[in-house]
């Protein structure tokens, strides 16, 4: 019997102001853990899988139940330790210490590979936490929409003089992360053709309004794209097909998209990528009997897809890696020039990171969408001279369906995060918001990750693989008084390729919370500015000076 599988479970986080725990500082992590497994949020909630292949919220259902039980009895001077999804200890700390400290999927570097991890996973000794799955701050596909939108807007500016009308994006993957591409692309003015092998995922994205149409053949999908482009109105199409097949077929036909990328779960060749010619049922069976054969076949198909991406790049498509490590997988099986197309961070996002700008997110623990709309208005009030940000908030309200507890993603940086958070805390204090909010972020942020094939690819000083930075980030957030802090390995790009940290803090309207919020939401993005200034980026150095950061070696 698999202790991780229970189809009878249907987890819905409590709404409103009635507490199940002893305070909001423990109620918040409980609700957010539960929200990660909401049926409209998680990819496979019955298996505790939130997103990203096998990214889980808890190691098994016994561990989940025990975490909930402990959070409900935890005092405000105690801290729960969670080791790879398993609650292993409660210790006396103090009121400003985190209520939960989490470490997921971390392995000594020599053993930091999928083979060793999978053995531990089968023995029930480890859990893959991805980024926000095991750190309890996943908010559904919205969590990556704005970052993807910002990337596609940058693509239009760099390659098409800012004009996306009549142009289209080819991509793969409509899972928890990839599902953002279709909505983000159309919001940026592109049509999008997204290949997906799992029809239930396409249907889920249709239901939550992230995909406009479904196609079952390439000809049908291309006709939909052509019709939309002729009409000047972007459309997103989920095509039920294997990305490797489709990408290669387009090369064969001489059909060149304007933009090419991919967000399949290529980071996990065993569980995340379906080999060409295989059905999902065949792959599921083979994973139980021949793991090495599945990995070999998956990587061979990735090589086909990456070669097609290179060919489409040669034909004129703006081609980018979207952080799933597919280039590395193809390189390992013989595609020697797999890295000839860039990753999205060095190509489009790094200037934002240099100012500590990244995926700031907040969640209304009340469950009331009005609380989010009120915070949207507060953001506009406090940042009045940013029409791009205002446009994003307007589009988000109009086009993004909430999944689980209402939430918002909003890319802001060092100069704005703390003051927005303090304003939210004040709104809770004076009753403008009906309950506390939690504020967190993706681990994909400016100072919280080391990932040489993604966030820290091609750093100016060559420090791509130095992982001291996310460790320092986690330590500083703990010292600053975050409500929960996490330190993970392998998120986004797979085992051996990344280390990263997460942070969440509760705005409960108290003066004590205001002090913690002011520290955490300043220090956290400041570590990103510090990291990039240390690497030699002038934008970061200037930001550090403007914001008065004390960086001894920058004097």
UniProtKB/Swiss-Prot annotation:
Q: Which positions are catalytic residues?
A: 410
Which residues are recorded as binding NAD(+)?
52-53, 130, 176-178, 196, 201, 242-243, 263-267, 273-274, 322, 492
- Record-level GO BP terms: L-histidine catabolic process to glutamate and formamide; L-histidine catabolic process to glutamate and formate
Q: How are cofactors bound according to the entry's free-text note?
A: Binds 1 NAD(+) per subunit.
Recorded catalytic activity of this chain's protein: 4-imidazolone-5-propanoate = trans-urocanate + H2O
Taxonomically, the superkingdom here is Bacteria
One GO cellular component term of this record is:
cytoplasm
MF terms (GO), sorted A to Z: urocanate hydratase activity
Q: Which keywords label this protein?
A: Cytoplasm, Histidine metabolism, Lyase, NAD
Signal peptide feature range? none
Q: Does the keyword Lyase apply?
A: yes
Q: Which cofactor does it need?
A: NAD(+)
Top-level EC class as recorded in UniProt = lyase
Gene3D superfamilies on file: Urocanase like domains, Urocanase superfamily
- Under Enzyme Commission nomenclature, its number is 4.2.1.49
Cell compartments where the protein resides = Cytoplasm
Q: In which pathway does it act?
A: Amino-acid degradation; L-histidine degradation into L-glutamate; N-formimidoyl-L-glutamate from L-histidine: step 2/3
PROSITE patterns associated with the record: UROCANASE (PS01233)
What is the documented function of this protein? Catalyzes the conversion of urocanate to 4-imidazolone-5-propionate.
Which HAMAP family is this protein grouped with?
Answer: HutU
Q: Which family does it belong to?
A: Belongs to the urocanase family.
Its recorded name reads: Urocanate hydratase
Organism, by scientific name, is Shewanella baltica (strain OS223)
- The gene name reads hutU
